[in-house]
């Protein structure tokens, strides 16, 4: 499959946030994840101990959305669903992790382990889609 967006002219009009802004091109080394947007869920905890409790629940087979609802301190408690996020709209470590993860589903989630540390706290991230 050929790489997308090499000159910026092949962008579709659907992705409102991404269209017209070529600022994402400044990181033209292109992380191996590919695509310009990911559908992301996360669990955010300020304290390391709490995020590790959440990690244990995930590893024991509890659904990602349930763990997010129970543990995440993010204001938007929709099972951790952040929706579609474009390159440049996330903080550095979160973005790197999100674009490095494979797409997975609730039945067999692939998530960041260990959690990712940002200025907001600790995140467990999973990716449900890529475009």
From Swiss-Prot:
Q: What is its EC number?
A: 5.2.1.8
Q: Where is this region: Disordered?
A: 1-39
Keyword Phosphoprotein present in the record's keywords: the answer is yes
Positions carrying Phosphoserine are 19
Q: Which residues form the PpiC domain?
A: 35-129
Name a GO CC annotation attached to this entry.
nucleoplasm
Where would you find this protein in the cell? Nucleus, Nucleolus; Cytoplasm, Cytoskeleton, Spindle; Cytoplasm
The identity of this protein, by name, is Peptidyl-prolyl cis-trans isomerase NIMA-interacting 4
The organism is Mus musculus (Mouse)
């Amino acid at each position: 499959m050929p790489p997308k967006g090499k000159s910026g002219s092949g962008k579709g009009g659907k992705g409102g946030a991404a269209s017209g802004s070529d600022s994402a091109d400044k990181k033209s080394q292109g992380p191996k994840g590919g695509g310009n947007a990911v559908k992301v869920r996360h669990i955010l905890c300020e304290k390391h101990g709490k995020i590790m409790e959440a990690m244990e629940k995930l590893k024991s087979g509890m659904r990602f959305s349930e763990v997010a609802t129970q543990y995440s301190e993010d204001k938007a408690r929709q099972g951790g669903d952040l929706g579609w996020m474009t390159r440049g709209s996330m903080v550095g470590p979160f973005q790197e992790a999100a674009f490095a993860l494979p797409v997975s589903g609730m039945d067999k989630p692939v998530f960041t382990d260990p959690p990712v540390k940002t200025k907001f706290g600790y995140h467990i991230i999973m990716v449900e889609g890529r475009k």
